Each structure stands twice: as structure tokens, then as C-alpha cells.
Design a protein with these regions (language model features):
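Non-catalytic, polymerase-adjacent accessory regions of viral genome-replication enzymes
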Residues: 1-63
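A conserved non-catalytic segment of reverse transcriptases
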Residues: 194, 199, 304-375, 390-391
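Polybasic, low-complexity binding patches
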Residues: 547-555, 567-607
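Short cysteine-rich loop/turn motifs with clustered Cys
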Residues: 508-539, 561-563
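Non-catalytic, peripheral interaction segments enriched in hydrophobic/basic residues
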Residues: 371, 378-441
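Histidine-centered nuclease catalytic patch
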Residues: 158, 530-562, 570-576
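Conserved polymerase palm-domain catalytic core
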Residues: 65, 80, 124-125, 130-133, ...
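Extended C-terminal regions of large enzymes
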Residues: 410-413, 417-506
Length: 607
């Protein structure tokens, strides 16, 4: 299907219209890919109103499942959505709509076809819920606007209950404008939007948070806002068409156009950075910010039917006050002078106060759980949970310029809790068996050990510069995928945290420790196929099985994908042929597979 997705993206870039998308969605290859994608999603274990999860889909015959999805798409009527209230930091709750697992599979089928079309139309500084975009990219873009461009006034706009107030008719018209002209597909999406919410009724507006396709639909709604703001300055046409040179990273140099707009127009210089429904507009002058604030508020109401929250929306002078964005708070401070004698301003980024308090409370909560257990297995799992949490917040917040200072504010309180609750069991000396922890925290004097297991110090963190996405990185072009693989030299931290948080309950501590060490050593890839593994695909295989006298030592374990693991142990010819077809191994990979089969005293595969 990758070739099909690439063609959809290329056609969308050229402005073509798409009138027969349902047939692509119904293709067996697309349905099978959708099944694989939701199977490795942890949310697939959450049941809808029918109480069914991914384990129920796993029981279906492959051809029967494909045929069932195709029939449902012919006359699609969605099941009711289960409503769950998720607590927010402010004490309120956020409604979450969970479709049935079959409806989620159908949404995934649609998402895979719509995403390349929409990606070609989305603005480059829209970062939420998009492939190869992240919160780090959004922070990097915001800091560039503040520090490099010199926009020291920021418009903070909070849309009131955005996901609950999306106009269905307007959304479908926006999809039509993007080139999605398949009326049958639009009617299916309309049915999804109007699906009954169990216990409440049929919604007249809003996109249900929790649906697989909802993030894409929300981006389609706000994409019009992005391009309206961009049209006010960055994409304003000039009388002369300037030839833009291309930088090494693929970004065009628009300095000539910008210089012309600054010198010969009275336009308001502004730049937008958005992550989902959280967006900021950066300006150089307060007078421009005031006018843009009112214009944006009115535009949202007139064009999208959305209101802003007056108490949360404001204009911030970054020289005096902080502006909060994605868990950070940003400000500018003076640092020396420019060659012309003017003060030089640099960004100062801290962790948001509420986020820092939440980190303190969560860390102390896990320490309390460690204190309450004396079972070695449970103790190990809780230490892994604590380490995983601390490493996760370090990884996310390390792009704050003052991250070390911020973590030191809570370090005393967290360490005090650690010593008071575990003081008789803590040791200063020990051996770090986790390779990643050893590389990142091994030089710290604050590392402590509990029954031989290292506990990560909460204040041992260094700032790293946030990186923006390279313009060439693209999931839907061959060149873009090459760039993606270049950036994957390291390991997937999300998978590492998952493995640390979810040790195999029936296995030994040695096994679980070596499982993490091997994942890091193999750079998150399957030892046979070389494919980078998602969390649910990671299997740790005993080269010499325990029943044959094997053990849990590092040398006797290896990380493989779940499908490869099945092939190592399977003696069923039908199963073997099925999964060999899925993997499409070459001779070298097949030799590695056979080597592991022989060690497990299984017959070599000859095909």
C-alpha cells in the first residue's frame, strides 16, 4: 500500500481531486495494514459498548475479517460510542468517546487513505497528531520566532471546548475543498460524527475524542485557520516573483520577500505555531498583536463557529511575562548586545509550575508504593516504573533552557521522601545493569541502589536544544523516508519506557533486566528481520529453551519480533507459510531464523 499512499500524496500536492476513495479503503491490503496498526496500539485493549477488544479480532480468520469490513463499508452504520470521563489537572473532566473495536478498525482503514491527501495540504508549523511532528518541533519553532525573528509579543488563544463544538457541516465542506470529493466516503464520516453516545444521545456537533480518525479531522478544521494567518504575512503575494534559494535542509530562503513586505507595506508581521488546538501567534509590535487578536477571535466565530475563552486568551509581552505552551513557560531576557549596540534577547524556557508540581507528586507516589512492598518481584517492577517515569520527564522537558534548575527545585523534596521511606534499604554502591541508564546516569554521584537495582536521580538532567523537523522528512516520499531512517539512529524511547513499565510478570528479574539491555544493544530492532519494533512487537526469545536446560542469561536471550518468534517455534506448515509471506525474508535473514530454530531443536525451514 505504500506506493498507493505515495501516489495519493503526490496527486494531492498537484491539487487533484479524489472521487473513488472508498474502493481504496476496501482493498484487502489496506484492511490488513489497518489491523496490524491497531493491534500494536495499547488502546486496542480498551473495550467499547460491545465489550470486545483486539483479542476478539485476533480470533477472526483473515479473509473473513476483510470480507466483514468490506460489507460494513458498503452500508456503514456505526455502533454507539462508550463515553468515559478522564480527570484533568484543573479538577474537571474531559469526555472521551471510545468506539467499538470494529469501528476503530474501519476508522484506521479510512485514516490510512486520507492522511497522505491531507498531509500535502497541511501547514508546516502545524505539529499535533501528524506523522514525524512532535511537541519538540513546536517548541523549536516558537523559540525561533522569539529569538531569531524577534517577535516578543505573543497572542495566546484558548478555543472554548474545541473538540465538542466542531461544526459537522463545515468540516465536510472543508474536506471537499481539500479535494476529497468521494460522496460515499463523506457520508461515512458524517455517520461517524453523528454516532450515538451511549447514555447521552446523538451529537449535533463535535468530534469524539478517543476515535482514531478524530485527530485528523480536528487538524482539517484548524488547517483553514493556519492558512488564513499565513496569508496575512508569510504568503502575501508581491508584485515581483522572487527566486528563492534552497538551504541544505530543504527550506526556501524567503528573506527577499520578507524584506519587501517590511519595507513597502503596512502589513502586520505575524507567525503562527500550532499543536492540535493549542496555538500561538507571534508579533513584533503590540499594536499589531491587538488588531490580530480581535481579527482572529472574530474569524474563528464567523468562519468556524468557535468561541474563545476570554479568561485564558490574552496578549503577552515576553520581555515581562511568561507564556505557557505544551507544559513549558517561555520568556525573553537580555544577554549582551548586538554589533549595533542594541540589546540581544534570548529565550528563557522553564517547566510550567503545574507540570513541575505534578512531577513532584507522581515521583513521591511511586516511592510510597515501593515502600509498601517487600516482594522482590513487585519491588523490581516499581523501581522500573519509577526510573521509566523520571527518564520520561527528563527526555520531554530537557529542551527547557533551565531544566536543571527546575528539577533541583523539587529534587530536595523527592530525595527526602526517598531517604525517609527507604533509608534502611538504600545503598550508595552497586552495579548498573541497564545499559541505557548506565550511559546516561552512570557518572552521577546521586545514583542509589535498592537490593542491587539502580534508582535514577531526579535532578541529573542537562539541557538539549529543541530540534525542528527537517522539511525533507516525509512519510509519503521515498526521499523523505530515507531522512526518517537517518534520524532513527537511536532507540525509540517510548518503547523503552513501555518495556521498563511492563516487565514480564512470570519471568525472573534477570530475564527482565536482560530484555531491556538487549533492546538497547540491538537498537530496538529485530535480530532476524532488522525491522524497528513497536512496543507490542518486542519478544525476548531464549536461544536455548528453559526446558532444554537454557537460562535467563544475557548470552542466551535475543530480541525478535512477535512474528519471528512464532516462526522460531512453529511446526505447523500452514502457519509457517503464512508468516514467511508476511515477513518476506531474504536468504541471509532466513539463515538467521534457521540458526535460532536449530538451537531450539526445531527443524530447519527449506523454501
Amino acid at each position: 500500500m505504500q506506493l498507493v499512499f505515495d501516489e495519493l500524496y503526490a496527486a494531492s500536492v498537484k491539487g487533484q481531486r479524489f472521487c473513488n476513495l472508498v474502493e481504496l479503503i476496501k482493498r484487502p491490503e489496506n484492511i490488513k495494514l489497518a489491523y496490524r496498526n491497531i493491534r500494536k496500539n495499547s488502546g486496542s485493549r480498551t473495550a467499547g459498548v460491545d465489550n470486545k477488544t483486539i483479542s476478539d479480532l485476533n480470533k477472526w480468520n483473515e479473509n473473513a475479517l476483510v470480507a466483514h469490513v468490506q460489507r460494513k463499508l458498503d452500508w456503514y452504520v456505526p455502533n454507539a460510542v462508550r463515553r468515559v470521563e478522564i480527570p484533568k489537572d484543573n479538577g474537571k473532566t474531559r469526555p472521551l468517546g471510545i468506539p467499538t473495536i470494529m469501528d476503530r478498525l474501519i476508522q484506521q482503514c479510512i485514516l490510512q487513505v486520507l492522511e497522505p491527501i491531507c498531509e500535502a495540504k497541511f501547514f508546516k508549523r502545524s505539529n499535533g497528531f501528524r506523522p514525524n511532528h512532535s511537541a519538540e518541533n513546536a517548541i523549536a519553532q516558537a523559540e525561533r520566532m522569539i529569538q531569531n525573528v524577534g517577535c516578543h509579543y505573543v497572542i495566546d488563544i484558548d478555543i472554548k471546548s474545541f473538540f465538542d463544538n466542531v461544526n459537522h457541516g463545515k468540516l465536510l465542506k472543508q474536506m471537499w475543498t481539500l479535494g476529497i470529493r468521494d460522496k460515499k466516503l463523506l457520508s461515512i464520516i458524517s455517520a461517524m460524527l453523528k454516532a450515538e453516545v451511549a447514555g447521552i444521545g446523538f451529537p449535533e456537533k463535535g468530534t469524539p475524542q478517543g476515535g482514531i480518525i478524530s485527530p485528523l479531522l480536528s487538524n482539517i478544521v484548524l488547517n483553514e485557520l493556519d492558512w488564513w494567518i499565513v496569508s496575512q504575512w508569510e504568503e502575501m503575494p508581491t508584485q515581483r516573483n522572487y527566486v528563492h534559494r534552497i538551504y541544505a535542509n530543504g527550506t526556501p530562503d524567503k528573506s527577499s520577500t520578507i524584506r519587501t513586505l517590511r519595507n513597502y507595506t503596512n502589513l502586520k508581521e505575524c507567525y503562527v505555531v500550532r499543536y492540535a488546538d493549542d496555538f500561538k501567534i507571534f508579533c513584533k509590535k503590540r499594536s499589531d498583536a491587538v488588531k490580530l487578536f480581535e481579527a482572529t477571535k472574530q474569524w474563528l466565530l464567523d468562519r468556524l463557529g468557535l468561541e474563545i475563552s476570554p479568561e485564558k486568551s490574552k496578549i503577552v509581552n515576553l520581555k515581562r511575562h511568561y507564556s505557557e505552551f505544551l507544559g513549558f513557560k517561555l520568556k525573553v531576557r537580555t544577554k549582551g548586545k548586538k554589533p549595533d549596540g542594541q540589546p540581544r534577547y534570548v529565550v528563557e524556557a522553564h517547566i510550567k509550575d503545574k507540570a513541575l508540581q505534578k512531577i513532584r507528586e507522581k515521583s513521591k507516589e511511586i516511592i510510597g508504593q515501593i515502600r509498601q512492598t517487600y516482594d522482590p518481584g513487585m519491588e523490581y517492577r516499581l523501581i522500573q516504573k519509577y526510573n521509566s517515569y523520571v527518564m520520561g520527564v527528563h527526555n520531554y522537558y530537557s529542551i527547557a533552557t533551565h531544566v536543571n534548575i527546575d528539577f533541583h527545585k523539587i529534587a530536595f523534596d523527592v530525595k527526602k521522601s526517598l531517604y525517609n521511606r527507604l533509608k534502611h534499604r538504600l545503598q550508595k554502591k552497586g552495579q548498573i545493569t541497564n545499559r541505557y541508564i548506565k550511559e546516561k546516569y552512570g557518572t552521577s554521584r546521586e545514583v542509589r541502589y535498592l537490593n542491587g537495582h539502580a534508582i535514577v536521580p531526579i535532578a541529573y538532567v542537562q539541557h538539549r536544544v529543541p530540534m525542528d523537523k527537517k522539511s525533507r522528512v516525509n512519510k509519503y516520499t521515498p526521499e523523505g523516508r530515507v531522512e526518517i531512517h537517518k534520524n532513527l539512529a537511536g532507540i525509540n524511547m517510548a518503547v523503552l519506557y513501555h518495556l521498563m513499565n511492563n516487565p514480564c510478570g512470570k519471568q525472573s528479574v534477570e530475564y527482565n533486566d536482560n530484555r531491556i539491555a538487549l533492546y538497547v544493544a540491538q537498537k530496538g530492532k529485530c535480530a532476524v528481520s532488522g525491522v524497528e519494533l513497536e512496543a507490542k512487537q518486542v519478544d525476548c526469545h531464549h536461544k536455548k529453551p528453559l526446558v532444554l536446560g537454557g537460562n535467563d542469561s544475557y548470552q542466551n536471550l535475543i530480541i525478535v519480533s512477535d512474528v519471528v518468534h512464532i516462526l522460531i517455534h512453529s511446526s505447523n506448515e500452514r502457519t509457517i507459510r503464512k508468516y514467511l509471506k508476511v515477513l518476506n525474508l531474504d536468504k541471509k535473514q532466513l539463515a538467521k531464523l534457521n540458526k535460532l530454530r536449530v538451537m531450539a531443536e526445531m527443524q530447519e525451514l527449506v523454501f
